[in-house]
Amino acid sequence: MAADAPHPAFEGYATEAVPQAAVGSPGKDGVLELTFERTADGTTLVHDYATVPFHISGTLGYDPLPEADTVFIQSPTGGVAQGDRHDVSITVGDEAVAHVSTQSSTKVQTMTCNYAAADTTLSVGAGGHLDYVPEPTILHADSRYLQELSVDLAPGATAVVSDVVVPGRLARGERFEFERYLSRVRATGPDGHLFEDATHLTPGDEDPTAPGVLGEFTVYGTTFVLAPDHDEAELSDALHAVVTDGDARAGATALPNGAGVAVRALGDRAETVQATLHAAWDHARIELLDAPAPSGRKY
């Protein structure tokens, strides 16, 4: 959980007191639980529990696949603040199909002490599918953000998991002024560990615009297409062909242990990276579910 012992890179921050509202105070520990099950009418949200800052307004008939269900996570707050600890748990039952996103970008606010953390756990039952495609994360100046996500796939399960990072309020000329960002993704399947991926950026210590990191680009995004029972080499080649036609600098590669494919994209605007990753998502969904991806519009 996000409130547990932090990653070693964040241990020093964890000892810093938060003056306005301590870690663990009401409104600081956000919890969201969603459970989807397959029913006679398709997929149904059978359990939901949310505490501030999370809120959902039911499900939406939004997906091109009739038997799928959609939830957009809402937040009444201005963003993620220092000392916030958020835990999200999404469970998709056997043969169920769910799409979960956020209604708007996650804004990680400027911090003077401590840090913010989010722990997301995704579980997909046998033959089920989950699309977890939130809006971008925007890292304001001096922010410190730890993001951990784990995915567990049952036999025959598939998932698409996406993440886009914007390193500041670009319209203001704010770029790479955050203090630390660490994102870790882990995936397991019926036979155990599939892969682990990490992004750790500390602009004050190492230049993220250096060659081999982000170079001349600003926005960074990744989409993981997790499909252990599919031919990852064939899927990787197909997705690579799709994303290299976009405006972003992008490519696709097969993940270890037959887990699926990772698609990465770099660009100067969030919209450019999102469009490229959406093209990959759309192609993957047609391959996995014989249905296109939903539109990225939320209004």
Swiss-Prot record:
Grouped into one coarse class, the protein's main location is cytoplasm
Q: Which family does it belong to?
A: Belongs to the UreD family.
What does the UniProt record say this protein does? Required for maturation of urease via the functional incorporation of the urease nickel metallocenter.
Lineage per the UniProt record: Archaea, Methanobacteriati, Methanobacteriota, Stenosarchaea group, Halobacteria
What are this entry's molecular-function GO terms?
nickel cation binding
Annotated localization:
Cytoplasm
Which top-level group of life is the source organism from?
Answer: Archaea
Subunit structure, interactors included: UreD, UreF and UreG form a complex that acts as a GTP-hydrolysis-dependent molecular chaperone, activating the urease apoprotein by helping to assemble the nickel containing metallocenter of UreC. The UreE protein probably delivers the nickel.
| A cellular component term, taken from the record's GO annotations | cytoplasm
Protein name as it appears in the record? Urease accessory protein UreD
Per UniProt, which keywords does this protein have? Chaperone, Cytoplasm, Nickel insertion, Plasmid
- Tell me which InterPro entries the record gives: UreD
